[in-house]
């Protein structure tokens, strides 16, 4: 009988729409790495802006609460993983208080970014969500880049990389977390 890992290390892959988060984390999951679980923030469902405003007081508040819920779920470790990889659009400032409060000892936050023209092409093309290619998304991407720079978070530019290449680079981040297991014990 396999015993569950107490609390997994968590790799947060954040970024704006079209940066390649979902595709890369899906590809990472396809590698079926031992002890690694891949999770998608939006799989919980994303309510309309109106519902976010009515029930949470706005999108920012919804994002903060859902980030906390995700971290609580991952810490509970229902899938018995050693490393949980969560991709989504959230602020590092929402991640850090929850990981401290919940006692997450091993985590990394990685920004997946790309040039605006590439993001726009991805959203209009394969994603078929051209409505997300706008000034607001560009501002969100710039905000996340600024936060990553200010907090000295690693940034992975997916502009000229294939999904498989980005997944390989994410695997390297998983290996870094796996290697830190002995240091945290």
Language model features with spans:
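Walker A/P-loop
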Residues: 22
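Glycine-rich phosphate-binding loop used to anchor ATP phosphates in small-molecule kinases
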Residues: 62-106
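Small-molecule kinase domains that catalyze NTP-dependent phosphoryl transfer to phosphate-bearing small molecules
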Residues: 129-169
């Amino acid at each position: 009988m396999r015993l569950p890992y107490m609390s997994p290390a968590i790799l947060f892959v954040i970024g704006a729409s079209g940066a390649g988060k979902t595709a890369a984390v899906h590809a990472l999951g396809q590698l079926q790495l031992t002890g690694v679980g891949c999770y998608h923030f939006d799989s919980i469902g994303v309510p309309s802006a109106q519902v976010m405003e009515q029930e949470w007081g706005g999108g920012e508040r919804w994002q903060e609460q859902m980030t906390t819920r995700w971290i609580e779920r991952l810490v509970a470790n229902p899938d018995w993983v050693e490393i949980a990889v969560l991709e989504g659009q959230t602020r590092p400032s929402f991640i850090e208080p929850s990981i401290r409060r919940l006692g997450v000892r091993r985590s990394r936050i990685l920004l997946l970014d790309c040039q605006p023209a590439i993001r726009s092409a991805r959203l209009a093309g394969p994603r078929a969500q051209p409505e997300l290619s706008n000034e607001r998304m560009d501002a969100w991407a710039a905000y996340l880049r600024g936060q990553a720079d200010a907090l000295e978070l690693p940034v992975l530019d997916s502009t000229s990389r294939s999904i498989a290449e980005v997944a390989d680079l994410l695997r390297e981040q998983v290996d870094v977390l796996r290697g830190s297991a002995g240091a945290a014990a």
